[in-house]
Amino acid sequence: DIVLPSAHWFEQVDLGFLFSTHPYLLWQDSQYFLHLNRWNSTSGVWQDCYTGTELAQYADIAADNSGVYVTYTTGSFPYVLHAFRFDNAAGTVSLLGDVIADNACNMEIAAANGSIGIGYRDLNDNNVPKLAVWDGTAWNTTTLSEQDCGTISVLADGNSIWVVPSGGKTDVFRWESGTVTNIPLPEAVQGRAFQMTPAVAQGNFYMTVNAQNPEEFVLYGLNKDGTWSLTGNPIAQSMVNQPVLAAQKQALYCLYATSDLQMQLKKLTLETETPAVTGDVNGDGTANLADTVLLQKYLLGETALTAAQAKAADLQADDSINGFDLAVLRQLLTKVA
């Protein structure tokens, strides 16, 4: 078991993982000062990485293979939005730019293959949802909708960032390489989606919808043509509290609290995918010269790979993509020919 850091009171707790295995804990104490800890598996203790010195009402954490990223607000009102990066190797904290927004809340942060995105509700602009993306030197902010929203969920998916504002007035948004795609909500929940929680499984996007009037808690999957389908039976015939949606292999797991504060965990087993073709880097169902070209461009730094493409390109299964994988692919195609 991993014991939480000693504290008189936890106001909010978030968990992030570096390299998918190293736990980081972001929490606020009774004064709403921010703390970042990392777990030392050798000594069995939480190590201090960062301690804030001013009020932080809202905060969230994300991580990728290069660092841990934290977004937070300062002040009791307005809530000034900031972000920093913790360098695991150096043990240092560096601010990412200056102020991101003068008055924001309900934000979440995601790290998508080097792109850092923060979705937030702008309290100085009629509560509309916005997305700020860090380009390495500055924040580029996009207003996603002119309609107001409540909470905002953000999810990294390969090179993409999904932004899901609650309230049922806005679309779902997908950002990739500076381009935002709008996906209208399912018609049945427009205007009554109190809360939505996203996940990606087997390359497909899913979201739970906590709906009002009538009350129900359902799961939708996004089809390839941009339409939505109800997935499985309703999770609950009532509104729920604090839902969490997560994907693991061929299943989706949903954890939530019922109206009488009972915890429920539901599992949905997804259809098994067709076995992958070895060497099919671009995902078109066959291994051919196009896969070699794509992998070579990636190694030359001319293009990026999605998470699925990167998995297919790791032909040596050593958690890295390099010239040896390209050599294996060429040898494989020679045998096929």
PLM feature spans:
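Extracellular, repeat-based ectodomains that mediate carbohydrate processing or recognition
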Residues: 1-273
